[in-house]
C-alpha cells in the first residue's frame, strides 16, 4: 500500500458513495447489529459500488447478499452452516477472534480482524495503484474510514481502524451475545471482518446504534440508513436471520463484482491479517460471523464479493482463501498493486462475489439461529446464561470502558480512528499475514480443520487461563517489514502515528515475499493442537521469549520456552490460536482501574508506521523474514523485544518490571485487551501480576518509517516489563515472537519506538540497574535484518549511547561480552522490547546457573529513543535484563561472569559430565578434593603461585558421554602486580622520610592524595556511618592540615602568613577581605542577637537598675552588684565588676552572658558561645555550648528562653567544630589547647575521628602513643584506636604514611633531634611488610634500614623498641636479602659508585685505625658473606662483641623511654608516648636461664655476662606498663626458671626512666628477693624495709635457683687507658690488705658458695700477681727504652704522616705488650710502692685508690666492656647516692615525683650512676651486698663468655670510657693491652 492517506480516503469496507461517517456508522451497525441482516437488505438499494458512486449497484447488492464471500474461486470457502458444531457452537468465539484479531493491529484494538485490516490495506493499496479507479478507491477508502469511524465511535480514542474496531467493539460489548452466524461480508480486503452481530452495536456505533435500535430489537442497524447499510437491517431480526442463513447456505457469490472489485478480492489473500487466527474463528463456527459479513456483501457486493470469492461448502463454514499458487497464477499485478482490474484474480473474485450473492439467500434459514446465538452470546442477557462468558463480556466492557473512556465517543473522531485503524490494519495485516498467511482474515476456512485452530492458531486461553496473570500485552505491531507478523503483535495502535500503508512487497522484506506468499497459513492444521494452557506459575515456566517478529518462532521448550504465541504451547510455533469460546478469546479484563487492555493504544505500542509485529509463535511454516537477531543466542524473554517504537503506543508509566517482578497472576485469568486477545491484560496489573511481555513490547521491529523521536503512548501493560520473579510462566496467549528460535536465543533487540517513560518506569519495578558495567559493542546489523531492522537501526542510532546502560562490567569475562557482541542485535539497547524485558528477568527454572543481573537500562524503546541518556553503546548485552539471558535460552546457562567463558557446548558438558572417582580411598573425601580445585598462594615479595586442575575427558566403551579425569595443572608463578595491578598514583610516596630533602616529594605526594580524595567524590552511603560524607570532607581537611605542617616545617603559627594560610585551609569559603575586618566579623551572624528578645535588650539604660548597682558598689557588695547587673542584663557592668573579682565569678558571668545573650539567638552561635567560654576560662565546659550534656546523655531538653522547644537537633552543634577551631586559632588564649583537646574528645566520642585528630594536632597537647596507652589521643592519624573492631585500620597504609608525614614535619623539619613518635617504628615495619607483599622489595628494604638506623641512633630507647620490633626488622631484612632484588635476580649485585666509594673509605679508615687486621686475625671478616647463603641470617654469634650502638646490644635492655614526664600516670612516657610491654617482657630471667629461648618465640638477644641481672628487684617497677611490647626496665631479662613473672633488677637507665613513684613488689617474689640495687627513682620505702643483708641476698639468690654471678655493680670492666692513680693505690691497698681485711662478700661468696668464692679468690690472686709481674716487667723495659730514646719523630708529624710514616717498631715486639701511645711525652711512670703506673701530671693518681678491690682472679672479665656502668663504690667511700647521679645523668620519668631514697644507708649499688642507654652492658647492673663491703665483680655468665678469653678481657674496641671517678676500680689493670 502506498500511504496512509489512501487508507484514510478509501476503505473497501466503506461505501464509496456514502459519507465516511455514514458509511462507517452503517457498516458498524450492520456488523454489530445482528438484526440488520444483509440477506434482508435489498441488494441494489443498499449498496453502491465500493469503487465509485457510479459503480454497479448490483455489485453492492451481491456483496450483501453473498453469505460470506470466500476466497478466490479456486480457493472457495464453504459457507458455515448451523450444522457445523464448531462453527455454530462457537460463533461467539469466531466473533471474538474477529474482534480481537484487529487488536493486533491497534495495540489495544483487538476487535479488528486481521483480515479486515488486510482488506483495508489491500484495498487502499489497490486503489492507490489504480489511477483509473481513483474515485472508486477514494470512495472505498471513505467507506473503510467511515466504517472505522462508526466502529470506533466508542473506540474513538484508541480503536480507529475500520473493521478492526468493529471486532474489537464487539468483543468489548458486554451486551454482545454470542451470534449464531456471521452476518455480513467477512472481507479481508481491508480488514473488514464486519461480522454483523445480533447484538446491540451501541458499543461501536453509539449514536447510530441508538438510531436503529428503534427499528431493531437488538439494536440492529435500521434499513433506513442511507448507503451501504441502508437496507441491511430492514426486517430486523428476520433480515438478520435470513442474512445468516444465506451466509450458511450460499455457495456462490450472489454478485459477480466488476474486475476492480475482483481485484480487491484478490487482494484479500494478500492481506492475510491472520495474526488473529482466522482459522480459529473459522474453526469455531465463525461462518456465522462470516455470514454477518456476507450479508454486507449484498450492499457492497462488488467489493466484498471480489474479496471473498469463497464458495460456500457444506459442513463447517470455512473461508479458505486461494492457495498462494492459485492467487499468484491468477494475479498478474505486482505486489504493490495486487488488485489490478485486469488481473484474472480480480475477475475471479468478481465472479465469486457475484456467485455468492445468491448464496446469501440460501443461508437465511440459519440466520435466525445465528441471530439467536448472537443474541444469546452477545446480549446483556448472555451474562446470565453464560456466566463465564458473561463475566468476560462484562469485564471486557468494563475494561474497554476503563481503558477507553472515550471509546464510545462521537463518530466525529472515527475518521481519525479510521485512519489509524487503517494504518494499524496494515500493520496487523503485515503481522497477521505472516502468521496466518491466509489471504483472507476470514475467521473460518473450511479447508482448515476446526479442531486444529489450537495447533494452527495460537492457543486462545480460556477466561480462566487469561486471568492467570498473563499480562494483556498485545505484541508491539511491527513495521510493514516486520519479518513475521504475529496474530497477537499486530494490534491496531491506539494512536498510530500517521504512517503510509505499506504494500506487501514492503513487508516481504520482513518475511513477505508477496501478498500471497503465505502458503504456510493454509497449513494451519499442521500446528499442534494447543490446549488451553493455564498460565504456568512463574517458577514452572519461564516467560515467553521476547516477541520479536523478526525472530523465527523458537521451538519453545515445553517446560521452559514460553509459548511463543498466546494460546500456543511453547512447543508449538504455529500461530493458529485454538478456537475458544467467545469469552476465552476475549480475556477478562482485570480490575478496571488497573489497566484497560482493550484500550487501543495503552496495551499495545502503536505501530503507526508499520504493521504490528507478528507474535512469537507465528507458525513456522509462515515464511517469517529471518530475524536479524534470531541467530543471536540471546533468548528474548519477552515478545516485546522487537517492537516498533514508533508504532508503539506510549503506555502509561507503569512498572516495567511489574509483570516479571510478580509472578504472573496465576490465580485470576487476565482478559486480554480487545487489542490483543493473546496478550490478556494481567489482572489489575497488581505488583505481583504485572503483565509479562505486553503487546507494545511485541518484537515487531519498527519499519524504517518508525520515528524514534515519537514514542507511542505508553501502554500501561506494555510498560510493565519482565519481572525478576524467576522463570516466567509460559504465556500461551502471548505470541511474543514469530521466530521459534526466539525462545532460546537471547535477544536484546529493542524497538526504538518505545517511550522513554517506560525506561524510567522500569526501575520502579524495584530492579536496580545491575552493578556490573555493560561491555560496549558497536551496533551490528545482521545481514538477515530486513528493511524494518534497518529502519530500526536508523532510529536506534541516535540512541546508540544509553547513559542508562551502566558502565561495562570490568569483571564480565571478555568471552561473554564478545559473545553478546556477536549475537546481540545492534538495536538491542536502543530498542529493548519491553516484552523481552518483561520476561527477561524470569529465567527458566532450568537456567539456575545464571542469575540474571538486575535489570539495568532495559527501558522501553521509546525511552531509549527519547532519553537523553541514550549515550551508551547500542550493543550492551549485559545491560539487557535477564531477557538477554532468556529464561528458556539454553544457549546461556552459565553465569556470564564466570571467568572461564567456554563455548556453550563445553559449558553444558562441564556441568553434566561425571568425574572418574579414584580408587585409592580419596573418593571418600567428603570435600571431593580429588576433583581438583584451583589453588592460589600469595608468597613473599608479591609473588603469586597458582595451579588450576586439568579436567581431561576420558571416553569408555558403552558410554556416550565421557567422564572427567582431574589432573594437576601447571604451576604458575607470577608477580602479584601482573594479576592485580595496583592503583598506581602519579606521585609515589618518598618514604622513608629521613631528611629534609624529601620535603618536596612529600608535598607532591600529599597534594596528589588530596586531589584523589577530592575527585573520588562522596563515598557510598553507609547506614552504619550516617556522617560518611562529612567524614570524607574532614579526612581531606586532615590531610591538608598535615600538608600545611610539612609546608611550614611543623609550625602551625608563628607568622601572619602561616596563620592566613591555615585559615584558608580550614575556611576556604572565607573571603580574603575578612582578614582586614575586625576579628570575629566573619562570625558576625552568630554574634548579633539584637533582633532576638527585643523586650529586654542588653545594657538597657535603666536608671533604677543603675542606681541599685551603684548602691551595692557603695556598700562594697561587688558580688551583689555583679549579679544585679546580670539580672538586669547590664552585661558590660557585670563583666567589668567581675573582672576585678575572683576568676570563678568572672567565669560565671561570662557563662550566663553566653547562655542568655549568645545562645538565645536563632542563628548558629554555638561556636561563638564556645569561644566565649574559652576566653572566660571555662575550658572544659566550652564544649557544652556545642553539644549540651543533656544531648550527650541522650536527652532532649526544651529551652524556655526562646519558648520554641527543641527546634533543631542538639547534635547539630558538632557541625560548628570548625568555626570554633578557627576562632581559637585566631584568638589564642592561655588554656585554649585544653579546650581543643576537649573538643577533640567530643568529636571522637561521636565518631568524627578525622575532625577530632585535627583538633588534637592543632592543640599541640595531644598524646601520640601506642595503641596500648590509655592516655594516647592519637595512634595513627585518621584511625580511632578506641573503637577498633579489628586491627585492619592499623594496617592502613594511608594512615601510617600520613602519621609518618606528621612525624617528619614535627621532628625532621622542625629540627628535633629525635623522632617524636618512637612507637611509629612498629607501624613502619608493618608498612615495610606491605611493600614486600606488593613486590616492592627495595622500598621495603629501605624501610628496614631506616628502622634499624633509628633504633641504633636512639640514645634513649623507648619501651616500644622491644624485642618484637628488633626481631621483626631482622626477619624482614633477612627475607628481603634472600629474595631477588627488584632490579634483577642475579647473584652478583651490580656495584654502584656509592658502594664502591663507601667500601674504599671504610677499608682505608680501618687500615689507618689499625682495625684491618681484626678480620684476618679473628676470621670474623666478610668471608662468610660469600656465596648464595651469605646473606641468610643465621644464629648470631653467641658472644657477639658488644657495640654501644649495636641494635642487638641495645634492644635487650629494652630501655624505657626517658621522658621528663609531668603526666598524671606514673608510667606515662616521657614524650607522652606511653611505653608498652607485654606481660612476658616483665618476666625476669636468671642467669641460668639466659640461654633459654626467649618468651617471644624468637632467638633471645645475645646478652653479655655483664648484662645478667642479679637477684631481681622485688618490685614491679613497671606495673601498669603498657602491653604494647616494650620491655621491662631491666631490659630483656631471662625468664626465671621457677616463676612465670619475676622481673629482675632493671637496668639503671630503664629503671630511671620508668621507675614509678610508688612501685609495688612483684606478687611472685618475696621481700627477700629484693635486689640491693635500686634504680635511680626507686623508692625503697615502698617496700617498708631496708635492703636485705648479704645473707638475705644470698638466700634470695638461692631461692631463685639460678646462678647469679657476684655483683659489684657493673661487673668486671676492663681498665681505662687513663690509669687512675687512685685506682692503683686502691689496688695496692686491696692487694696488701687482702689477707688482712675480710674480702667483700660478693654474690659468689654468699652462703653455700663460700668454698667456691675462696677458690676463685685464690685463683684470681695468683693470676693477678702473675699479670702484674709481667706487666711491670714489660712496662719497665719499655719505659727504660723510651727514656733512653729521644721522643719519636712520628709524634711531631701530622695525622696523615702519622698514619703512613709512623714507625711500627713498637708494634713489632712479638708477643710483648703493646705500649700505650700516651702522647708526645710519656708522663707515666711506674710507682713501685703503689705497684702501678702513675701519671705525673695527675697528682691525684698517686693517691691510693679506695675503690673496691679487683674481682677475684678466677672470674673472667665480661665479654663486653661495661665501661658505662662501673660497679658502684662502697657507700663508705661516700659515693654520691644513685639518685643524685641518676638525676644528673637522666631525667626522671616518674610523674612529677622526685626520686626518693630510704632512710636506710644507700647500698653500694646506688653508687653506680645510671647507665647510658646505649648498650646492654650499661643496663646490666648487678646488686652488691647491701652492707657496702666491696665484693668481687660478678662472674660473667659462663654460657656467654669465657673467663680466659682474651677477647672477652679486651672487649669491643668501641667500649665507652666511664667517668674518671669510676676509673679507680680499674686502676689495677693498667695493662695497655686492654685498650
UniProtKB/Swiss-Prot annotation:
Compositional bias of kind Low complexity: 596-607, 660-674, 853-868, 1484-1495, 1775-1785
Composition skew (Pro residues), residue ranges: 539-559, 692-702, 766-781
Lineage top rank: taxon: Eukaryota
Subcellular location: Endoplasmic reticulum membrane
Segments of skewed composition (Polar residues): 273-290, 322-360, 413-428, 454-466, 1434-1443, 1531-1541, 1563-1572, 1587-1599
Biased composition annotated in UniProt, kind: Basic and acidic residues: 93-116, 214-223, 503-512, 1661-1683
Keywords tagged on the record: Autophagy, Endoplasmic reticulum, ER-Golgi transport, Membrane, Protein transport, Transport
InterPro entries, per database record: Sec16_CCD, Sec16_N, Sec16_Sec23-bd
Membrane-related topology note: Peripheral membrane protein
UniProt keyword annotation of Transferase present: no
Acidic residues: compositionally biased ranges: 378-391, 399-409
Region of interest (Disordered), ranges: 34-140, 211-241, 258-814, 835-868, 1413-1443, 1475-1717, 1733-1875
CDD domains: ACE1-Sec16-like
One Gene Ontology biological process: Golgi organization
Keyword Cell wall biogenesis/degradation: no
Cellular component aspect of the GO annotation: endoplasmic reticulum exit site; endoplasmic reticulum membrane; ER to Golgi transport vesicle membrane
PANTHER family in the cross-refs: RGPR-RELATED, SECRETORY 16, ISOFORM I
Entry similarity comment: Belongs to the SEC16 family.
Role noted for this protein: Involved in the initiation of assembly of the COPII coat required for the formation of transport vesicles from the endoplasmic reticulum (ER) and the selection of cargo molecules. Also involved in autophagy.
Protein's name according to its UniProt entry: COPII coat assembly protein sec16
Organism: Aspergillus clavatus (strain ATCC 1007 / CBS 513.65 / DSM 816 / NCTC 3887 / NRRL 1 / QM 1276 / 107)
Lineage: Eukaryota, Fungi, Dikarya, Ascomycota, Pezizomycotina
Amino acid at each position: 500500500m502506498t500511504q496512509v492517506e489512501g487508507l484514510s480516503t478509501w476503505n473497501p469496507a466503506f461505501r464509496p458513495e456514502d459519507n465516511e461517517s455514514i458509511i462507517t456508522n452503517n457498516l458498524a451497525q450492520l456488523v454489530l447489529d445482528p438484526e440488520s441482516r444483509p440477506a434482508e437488505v435489498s441488494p441494489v438499494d443498499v449498496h453502491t459500488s465500493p469503487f465509485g458512486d457510479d459503480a454497479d449497484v448490483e455489485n453492492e447488492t451481491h456483496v450483501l447478499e453473498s453469505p460470506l464471500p470466500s476466497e478466490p474461486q479456486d480457493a472457495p470457502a464453504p459457507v458455515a452452516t448451523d450444522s457445523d458444531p464448531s462453527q455454530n457452537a462457537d460463533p461467539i468465539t469466531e466473533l471474538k477472534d474477529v474482534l480481537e484479531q484487529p487488536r493486533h493491529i491497534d495495540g489495544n484494538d483487538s476487535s479488528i480482524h486481521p483480515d479486515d485490516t488486510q482488506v483495508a490495506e489491500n484495498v487502499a493499496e489497490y486503489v492507490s495503484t489504480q489511477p483509473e479507479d481513483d474515485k472508486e478507491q477514494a470512495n472505498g477508502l471513505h467507506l473503510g474510514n467511515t466504517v472505522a469511524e462508526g466502529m470506533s465511535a466508542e473506540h474513538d480514542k484508541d480503536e480507529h481502524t475500520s473493521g478492526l474496531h468493529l471486532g474489537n467493539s464487539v468483543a468489548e460489548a458486554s451486551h454482545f451475545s454470542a451470534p449464531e452466524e456471521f452476518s455480513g461480508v467477512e472481507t479481508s480486503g481491508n480488514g473488514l471482518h464486519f461480522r454483523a452481530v445480533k447484538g446491540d452495536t451501541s458499543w461501536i456505533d453509539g449514536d447510530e446504534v441508538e438510531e436503529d435500535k428503534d427499528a431493531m430489537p437488538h439494536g440492529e442497524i435500521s434499513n433506513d440508513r442511507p448507503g451501504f447499510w441502508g437496507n441491511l437491517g430492514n426486517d430486523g431480526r428476520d433480515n438478520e436471520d435470513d442474512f445468516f442463513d444465506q451466509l450458511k447456505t450460499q455457495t456462490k457469490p450472489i454478485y459477480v463484482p466488476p474486475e476492480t472489485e475482483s481485484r480487491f478480492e484478490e487482494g484479500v489473500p494478500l492481506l492475510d491479517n491472520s495474526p488473529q487466527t482466522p482459522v480459529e474463528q473459522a474453526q469455531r463456527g465463525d461462518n456465522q460471523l462470516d455470514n454477518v459479513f456476507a450479508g454486507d456483501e449484498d450492499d457492497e457486493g462488488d467489493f466484498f464479493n471480489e474479496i471473498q470469492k469463497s464458495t460456500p461448502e457444506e459442513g463447517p463454514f470455512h473461508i479458505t482463501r486461494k492457495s498462494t499458487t492459485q492467487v499468484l497464477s491468477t494475479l498478474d499485478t505486482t505486489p504493490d498493486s495486487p488488485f489490478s482490474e485486469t488481473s484474472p484474480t480480480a475477475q475471479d473474485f468478481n465472479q465469486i462475489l457475484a456467485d455468492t450473492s445468491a448464496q446469501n439467500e440460501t443461508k437465511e434459514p440459519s440466520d435466525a439461529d445465528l441471530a439467536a446465538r448472537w443474541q444469546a452470546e452477545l446480549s446483556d442477557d448472555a451474562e446470565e446464561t453464560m456466566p463465564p462468558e458473561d463475566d468476560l463480556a462484562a469485564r471486557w466492557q468494563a475494561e474497554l470502558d476503563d481503558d477507553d473512556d472515550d471509546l464510545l465517543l462521537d463518530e466525529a473522531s472515527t475518521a481519525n480512528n479510521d485512519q489509524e485503524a487503517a494504518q494499524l490494519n496494515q500493520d496487523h495485516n503485515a503481522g497477521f499475514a505472516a502468521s496466518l498467511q491466509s489471504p483472507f482474515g476470514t475467521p473460518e476456512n473450511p479447508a482448515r480443520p476446526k479442531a486444529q485452530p489450537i495447533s494452527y492458531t495460537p492457543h486462545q486461553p480460556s477466561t480462566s487461563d487469561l486471568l492467570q496473570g498473563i499480562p494483556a500485552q498485545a505484541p508491539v505491531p511491527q513495521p510493514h517489514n516486520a519479518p513475521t507478523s504475529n496474530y497477537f503483535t499486530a494490534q491496531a495502535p491506539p494512536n498510530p502515528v500517521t504512517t503510509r500503508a505499506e504494500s506487501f512487497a514492503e513487508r516481504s522484506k520482513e518475511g513477505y515475499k508477496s501478498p500471497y506468499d503465505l502458503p504456510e497459513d493454509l497449513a494451519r492444521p499442521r500446528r499442534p493442537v494447543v490446549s488451553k494452557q493455564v498460565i504456568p506459575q512463574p517458577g514452572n515456566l519461564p516467560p515467553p521469549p521476547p516477541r520479536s517478529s523478526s525472530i523465527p518462532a523458537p521451538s519453545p521448550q515445553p517446560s521452559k520456552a514460553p509459548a511463543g504465541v498466546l494460546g500456543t504451547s511453547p512447543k508449538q510455533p504455529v500461530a493458529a490460536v485454538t478456537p475458544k469460546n467467545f469469552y476465552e478469546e476475549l480475556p477478562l479484563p482485570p480490575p478496571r482501574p488497573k489497566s484497560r487492555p482493550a484500550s487501543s493504544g495503552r496495551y499495545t505500542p502503536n505501530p503507526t508506521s508499520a504493521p504490528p509485529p507478528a507474535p512469537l509463535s507465528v507458525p513456522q511454516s509462515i515464511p517469517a523474514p529471518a530475524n536479524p537477531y534470531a541467530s543471536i543466542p540471546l533468548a528474548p524473554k519477552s515478545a516485546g523485544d522487537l517492537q516498533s517504537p514508533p508504532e508503539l503506543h506510549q503506555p502509561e508509566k507503569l512498572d516495567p518490571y511489574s509483570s516479571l517482578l510478580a509472578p504472573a497472576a496465576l490465580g485470576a485469568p487476565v482478559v486480554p485487551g480487545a487489542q490483543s486477545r493473546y496478550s490478556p491484560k494481567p489482572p489489575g496489573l497488581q505488583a505481583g501480576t504485572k503483565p509479562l511481555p505486553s503487546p507494545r513490547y511485541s518484537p515487531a521491529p519498527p519499519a524504517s518509517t518508525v520515528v524514534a523521536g515519537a514514542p507511542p503512548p505508553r501502554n500501561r501493560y506494555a510498560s510493565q516489563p519482565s519481572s525478576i520473579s524467576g522463570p516466567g510462566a509460559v504465556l500461551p496467549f502471548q505470541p511474543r515472537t514469530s521466530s521459534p528460535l526466539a525462545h532460546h536465543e537471547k535477544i536484546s533487540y529493542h524497538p526504538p519506538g518505545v517511550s522513554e517513560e517506560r525506561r524510567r518506569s522500569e526501575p520502579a519495578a524495584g530492579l536496580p540497574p545491575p552493578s556490573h558495567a555493560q561491555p560496549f559493542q558497536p551496533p551490528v546489523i545482521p545481514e538477515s535484518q530486513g528493511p524494518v531492522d534497518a529502519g530500526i537501526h536508523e532510529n536506534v542510532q541516535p540512541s546508540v549511547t544509553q547513559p542508562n546502560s551502566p558502565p561495562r562490567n570490568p569483571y564480565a569475562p571478555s568471552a561473554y561480552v564478545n559473545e553478546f557482541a556477536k549475537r546481540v542485535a545492534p538495536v538491542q539497547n536502543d530498542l529493548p522490547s519491553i516484552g523481552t524485558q518483561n520476561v527477561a528477568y524470569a529465567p527458566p527454572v532450568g537456567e539456575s546457573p545464571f542469575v540474571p543481573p538486575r535489570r539495568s537500562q532495559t527501558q522501553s524503546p521509546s525511552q531509549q529513543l527519547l532519553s537523553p541518556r541514550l549515550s551508551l553503546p547500542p550493543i550492551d548485552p549485559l545491560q539487557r535484563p535477564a531477557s538477554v539471558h532468556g529464561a528458556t535460552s539454553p544457549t546461556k546457562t552459565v553465569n556470564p561472569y564466570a571467568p572461564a567463558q567456554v563455548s556453550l557446548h563445553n559449558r553444558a558438558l562441564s556441568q553434566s559430565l561425571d568425574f572418574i572417582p579414584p580408587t585409592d580411598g580419596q573418593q571418600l573425601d567428603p570435600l571431593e578434593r580429588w576433583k581438583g580445585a584451583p589453588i592460589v598462594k600469595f608468597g613473599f615479595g608479591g609473588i603469586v603461585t597458582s595451579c588450576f586442575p586439568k579436567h581431561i575427558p576420558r571416553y569408555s566403551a558403552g558410554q556416550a558421554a565421557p567422564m572427567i579425569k582431574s589432573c594437576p595443572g601447571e604451576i604458575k608463578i607470577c608477580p602479584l602486580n601482573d594479576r592485580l595491578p595496583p592503583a598506581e598514583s602519579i606521585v609515589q610516596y618518598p618514604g622513608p622520610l629521613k631528611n629534609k630533602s624529601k620535603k618536596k616529594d612529600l608535598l607532591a605526594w600529599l597534594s596528589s592524595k588530596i586531589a584523589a580524595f577530592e575527585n573520588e567524590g562522596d563515598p557510598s552511603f553507609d547506614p552504619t556511618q550516617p556522617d560518611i560524607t562529612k567524614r570524607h570532607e574532614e579526612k581531606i581537611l586532615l590531610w591538608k592540615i598535615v600538608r600545611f605542617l610539612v609546608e611550614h616545617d611543623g609550625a602551625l603559627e608563628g607568622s601572619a602568613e602561616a596563620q592566613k594560610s591555615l585559615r584558608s585551609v580550614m575556611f576556604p569559603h572565607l573571603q580574603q577581605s575578612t582578614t582586614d575586618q575586625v576579628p570575629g566579623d566573619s562570625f558576625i551572624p552568630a554574634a548579633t542577637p539584637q533582633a532576638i528578645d527585643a523586650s529586654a535588650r542588653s545594657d538597657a539604660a535603666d536608671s533604677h537598675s543603675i542606681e541599685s548597682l551603684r548602691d551595692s558598689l557603695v556598700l562594697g557588695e561587688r558580688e551583689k552588684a555583679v549579679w544585679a547587673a546580670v539580672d538586669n542584663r547590664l552585661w558590660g557592668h557585670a563583666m567589668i565588676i567581675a573582672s576585678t573579682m575572683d576568676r570563678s565569678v568572672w567565669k560565671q558571668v561570662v557563662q550566663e552572658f553566653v547562655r542568655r545573650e549568645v545562645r538565645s539567638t536563632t542563628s548558629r552561635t554555638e561556636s561563638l558561645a564556645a569561644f566565649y567560654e574559652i576566653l572566660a576560662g571555662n575550658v572544659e565546659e566550652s564544649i557544652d555550648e556545642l553539644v549540651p550534656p543533656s544531648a550527650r546523655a541522650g536527652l532532649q531538653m526544651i529551652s524556655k528562653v526562646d519558648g520554641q522547644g527543641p527546634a533543631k537537633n542538639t547534635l547539630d552543634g558538632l557541625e560548628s567544630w570548625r568555626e570554633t577551631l578557627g576562632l581559637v586559632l585566631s584568638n589564642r588564649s592561655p588554656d585554649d589547647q585544653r579546650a581543643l583537646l576537649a573538643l577533640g574528645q567530643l568529636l571522637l566520642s561521636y565518631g568524627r575521628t578525622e575532625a577530632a585528630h585535627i583538633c588534637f594536632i592543632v592543640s599541640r597537647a595531644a598524646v601520640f602513643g601506642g595503641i596500648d596507652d590509655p592516655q594516647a589521643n592519637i595512634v595513627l592519624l585518621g584511625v580511632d584506636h578506641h573503637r577498633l573492631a579489628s586491627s585492619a585500620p592499623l594496617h592502613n597504609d594511608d594512615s601510617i604514611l600520613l602519621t609518618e608525614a606528621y612525624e617528619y614535619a614535627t621532628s625532621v623539619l622542625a629540627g628535633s633531634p629525635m623522632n617524636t613518635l618512637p612507637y611509629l617504628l612498629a607501624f613502619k615495619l608493618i608498612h615495610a611488610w606491605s611493600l614486600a607483599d606488593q613486590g616492592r622489595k627495595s622500598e621495603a628494604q629501605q624501610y628496614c634500614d631506616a628502622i634499624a638506623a633509628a633504633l641504633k641512633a636512639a640514645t634513649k630507647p623507648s619501651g616500644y623498641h622491644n624485642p618484637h620490633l628488633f626481631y621483626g626488622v631482622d626477619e624482614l631484612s633477612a627475607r628481603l636479602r634472600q629474595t631477588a632484588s627488584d632490579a634483577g635476580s642475579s647473584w652478583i649485585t651490580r656495584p654502584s659508585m656509592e658502594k664502591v666509594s663507601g667500601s674504599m673509605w671504610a677499608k682505608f679508615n680501618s687500615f689507618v685505625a689499625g682495625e684491618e687486621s681484626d678480620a684476618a686475625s679473628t676470621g670474623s671478616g666478610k668471608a662468610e658473606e660469600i656465596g648464595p647463603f651469605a646473606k641468610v641470617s643465621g644464629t648470631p654469634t653467641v658472644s657477639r662483641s658488644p657495640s654501644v650502638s649495636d641494635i642487638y646490644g641495645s634492644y635487650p635492655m629494652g630501655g624505657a623511654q626517658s621522658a621528663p614526664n609531668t603526666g598524671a600516670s606514673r608510667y606515662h612516657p616521657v614524650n607522652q608516648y606511653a611505653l608498652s610491654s607485654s606481660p612476658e617482657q616483665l618476666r625476669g630471667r636468671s642467669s641460668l636461664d639466659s640461654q633459654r629461648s626467649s618468651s617471644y618465640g624468637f632467638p633471645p638477644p645475645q646478652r653479655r655476662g655483664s648484662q645478667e641481672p642479679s637477684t631481681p628487684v622485688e618490685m614491679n617497677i613497671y606495673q601498669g606498663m603498657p602491653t604494647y611490647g616494650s620491655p621491662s626496665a631491666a631490659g630483656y631479662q631471662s625468664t626465671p626458671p621457677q616463676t612465670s613473672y619475676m622481673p629482675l633488677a632493671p637496668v639503671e637507665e630503664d629503671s630511671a626512666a620508668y621507675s614509678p613513684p610508688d612501685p609495688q613488689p612483684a606478687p611472685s617474689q618475696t621481700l627477700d628477693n629484693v635486689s640491693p640495687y635500686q634504680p635511680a627513682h626507686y623508692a625503697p620505702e615502698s617496700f617498708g624495709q631496708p635492703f636485705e643483708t648479704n645473707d638475705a641476698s644470698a638466700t634470695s639468690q638461692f631461692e631463685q635457683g639460678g646462678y647469679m654471678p657476684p655483683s659489684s655493680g657493673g661487673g668486671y670492666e676492663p681498665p681505662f687507658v687513663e690509669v687512675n692513680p687512685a685506682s692503683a693505690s686502691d689496688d695496692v691497698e686491696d692487694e696488701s690488705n687482702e689477707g688482712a681485711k675480710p674480702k667483700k662478700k660478693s654474690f659468689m661468696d654468699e652462703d653455700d658458695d663460700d668454698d667456691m668464692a675462696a677458690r676463685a679468690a685464690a685463683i684470681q690472686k695468683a693470676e693477678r700477681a702473675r699479670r702484674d709481674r709481667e706487666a711491670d716487667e714489660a712496662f719497665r723495659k719499655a719505659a727504660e727504652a723510651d727514656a733512653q730514646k729521644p721522643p719519636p719523630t712520628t709524634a711531631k708529624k701530622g695525622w696523615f704522616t702519622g698514619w703512613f710514616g709512623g714507625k711500627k717498631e713498637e708494634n713489632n715486639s712479638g708477643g710483648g705488650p703493646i705500649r700505650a701511645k700516651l702522647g708526645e711525652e710519656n708522663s707515666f711512670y711506674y710507682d713501685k710502692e703503689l705497684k702501678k703506673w702513675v701519671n705525673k701530671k695527675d697528682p691525684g693518681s698517686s693517691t691510693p685508690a679506695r675503690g673496691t678491690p679487683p674481682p677475684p682472679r678466677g672470674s673472667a672479665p665480661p665479654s663486653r666492656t661495661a665501661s658505662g656502668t662501673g660497679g658502684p663504690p662502697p657507700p663508705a667511700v661516700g659515693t654520691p647516692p644513685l639518685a643524685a647521679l641518676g638525676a644528673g645523668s637522666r631525667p626522671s620519668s616518674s610523674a612529677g615525683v622526685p626520686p626518693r631514697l630510704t632512710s636506710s644507708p644507700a647500698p653500694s649499688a646506688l653508687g653506680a650512676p645510671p647507665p647510658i642507654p646505649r648498650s646492654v652492658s650499661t643496663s646490666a647492673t648487678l646488686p652488691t651486698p647491701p652492707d657496702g663491703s666491696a665484693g668481687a665483680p660478678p662472674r660473667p655468665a659462663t654460657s656467654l663468655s669465657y673467663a680466659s678469653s682474651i677477647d672477652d678481657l679486651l672487649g669491643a674496641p668501641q667500649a665507652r670510657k666511664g667517668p674518671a671517678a669510676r676509673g679507680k676500680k680499674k686502676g689495677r689493670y693498667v695493662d695497655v693491652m686492654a685498650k
